[in-house]
């Protein structure tokens, strides 16, 4: 074993995590370690079954003493034979790095920051917030959970985030990976997990699955149309199309949504539905409502349609309702849609009375879920839901749409 490098690695690690490395002001207590404490080096040094380890370590210590990089305190009466403590000499720290073949931590940090620099002006706030925290942590000599040795990995992350912010439409994961990296699996195997960790920590919306997190930034497992059913006229490339002519509704692909113009909504109201089963049951029995399936949090193509619908409603007001799960996620989805698209959005069958009627079919939740509901209860942004949240906390159950559909039919 290269004991010289091992000794210096331990000492330099202690130095890099010290106040001295951060402030430049030398502490009276130099970076050091003791062979009396339990660690890998002391285990080898004090191995009575293999005395050669001590001889090799002593040889390494004496060479480093000769080069003035370290100072050694020997056991009493055992000078040059049994070491007790090893100290790093401040004046010879640069030589210690060179001798060990180790790149200084500060240089690694600076290189990572240079790689991450484009994220300082990224259009997504959670990305900018993460970059800012990394920058501040580095200034305080903390790594902020950054792998300083994985420069390539962060280069790939920056490349992915830079391309994602410019996406107008959603894109299948493997198509995106091939387009950006020339490898259909690289995003999923190398970048996805790191991106999700950052997004979950700094994003302002808490999704229920990795799939939903990725969909919210435009990454899909597969392309999905937007399902819509109602008596609405649209125009695409100059041609008028009456969607009311399709009794089972219609699936709009991204390119169609991009080019369509909403001409007229003949229905008396609009209902956004979170769950597919509920959507299908509702379109069977209602003929004067425009239904749109959101599939949980609206994906990019759903968002594009909702934006166009919102523009139409500015001059042709029609009531808009959202029908979602009676749980933490359902509340979040409602508030997101209200905040982003329809300020007058109203909930449908998401009240205390509906909850009480179907709570016996609900799913129990644990302490972590309860804590999230309690935070909502403390936030006035969710005041519309406080009575429902109190009821959920009392019953310790959440009610999904499928339960309501199944027990009403």
UniProtKB/Swiss-Prot annotation:
InterPro entries xref list: JetD_C, Spo11/TopoVI_A_sf
- What SUPFAM superfamilies does this protein map onto? DNA topoisomerase IV, alpha subunit
| One Pfam family named in its UniProt record | JetD_C
Gene3D superfamilies with a match to the protein in the record: 3.40.1360.10
> Any idea which GO molecular function terms this record carries?
DNA binding
State any GO CC term: chromosome
Which stretches are transmembrane?
A: none
Q: What happens when the gene is disrupted?
A: When this gene is missing the Wadjet system does not confer plasmid-transformation resistance in B.subtilis.
Q: Which domain of life is it from?
A: Bacteria
The record's function comment reads: Component of antiplasmid transformation system Wadjet type I, composed of JetA, JetB, JetC and JetD. Expression of Wadjet type I in B.subtilis (strain BEST7003) reduces the transformation efficiency of plasmid pHCMC05.
The entry's protein name is: Wadjet protein JetD
Point out the gene that encodes the protein.
jetD
């Amino acid at each position: 074993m290269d004991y010289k490098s091992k000794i210096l690695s331990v000492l330099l690690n202690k130095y890099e995590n010290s106040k001295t490395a951060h402030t430049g002001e030398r502490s009276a207590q130099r970076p050091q370690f003791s062979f009396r404490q339990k660690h890998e080096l002391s285990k080898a040094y004090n191995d009575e079954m293999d005395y050669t380890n001590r001889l090799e370590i002593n040889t390494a210590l004496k060479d480093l003493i000769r080069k003035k990089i370290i100072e050694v305190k020997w056991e009493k009466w055992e000078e040059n034979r049994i070491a007790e403590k090893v100290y790093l000499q401040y004046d010879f720290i640069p030589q210690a790095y060179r001798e060990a073949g180790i790149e200084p931590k500060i240089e690694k940090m600076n290189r990572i920051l240079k790689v991450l620099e484009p994220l300082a002006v990224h259009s997504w706030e959670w990305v900018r917030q993460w970059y800012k925290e990394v920058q501040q942590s580095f200034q305080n000599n903390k790594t902020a959970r950054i792998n300083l040795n994985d420069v390539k990995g962060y280069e790939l992350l920056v490349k992915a985030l830079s391309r994602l912010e410019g996406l107008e439409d959603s894109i299948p994961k493997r198509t995106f990976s091939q387009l950006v990296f020339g490898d259909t699996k690289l995003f999923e195997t190398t970048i996805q997990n790191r991106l999700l960790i950052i997004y979950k920590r700094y994003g302002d919306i808490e999704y229920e699955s990795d799939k939903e997190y990725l969909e919210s930034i435009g990454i899909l497992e597969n392309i999905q149309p937007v399902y819509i059913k109602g008596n609405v006229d649209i125009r695409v490339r100059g041609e008028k199309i009456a969607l009311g002519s399709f009794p089972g509704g219609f699936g709009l692909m991204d390119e169609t949504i991009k080019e369509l113009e909403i001409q007229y909504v003949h229905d008396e109201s609009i209902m956004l539905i979170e769950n597919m089963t509920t959507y299908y049951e509702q379109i069977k029995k209602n003929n004067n409502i425009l239904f749109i399936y959101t599939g949980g949090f609206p994906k990019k193509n759903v968002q594009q349609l909702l934006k166009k619908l919102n523009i139409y409603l500015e001059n042709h007001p029609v009531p808009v309702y959202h029908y979602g799960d009676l749980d933490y996620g359902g509340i979040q989805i409602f508030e997101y849609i209200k905040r982003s698209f329809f300020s007058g959005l109203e909930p449908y069958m998401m009240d205390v009375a509906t909850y009480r009627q179907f709570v016996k079919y609900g799913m129990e939740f644990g302490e972590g879920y309860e804590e999230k509901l309690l935070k909502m209860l403390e936030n006035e942004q969710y005041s519309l839901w406080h009575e429902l949240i109190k009821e959920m906390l009392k019953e310790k159950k959440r009610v999904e749409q499928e339960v309501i559909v199944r027990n009403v039919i």
